[in-house]
């Protein structure tokens, strides 16, 4: 999992990551 700062959709991918972690 990588976040490219300033890339459109980064927040959405972050949300998906947190869901995968069960947070």
Curated annotation (Swiss-Prot):
Show the GO MF annotations. Answer: actin binding
Q: From the Swiss-Prot or TrEMBL record, state where the protein is found.
A: Cytoplasm, Cytoskeleton
Chief subcellular site?
A: cytoplasm
The membrane spanning regions, by residue number, are none
GO cellular component terms, A-Z: cytoplasm; cytoskeleton
Q: Where is the signal peptide?
A: none
KW Cytoplasm (keyword) present:
yes
The protein's UniProt keywords, in alphabetical order, are:
Actin-binding, Allergen, Cytoplasm, Cytoskeleton
Free-text function comment from the UniProt entry = Binds to actin and affects the structure of the cytoskeleton. At high concentrations, profilin prevents the polymerization of actin, whereas it enhances it at low concentrations. By binding to PIP2, it inhibits the formation of IP3 and DG.
Q: What else is known?
A: On the 2D-gel the determined pI of this protein is: 4.5, its MW is: 14 kDa.
Entry similarity comment? Belongs to the profilin family.
Q: Oligomeric state and partners?
A: Occurs in many kinds of cells as a complex with monomeric actin in a 1:1 ratio.
Descriptive protein name: Profilin
Which organism is this entry from? Beta vulgaris (Sugar beet)
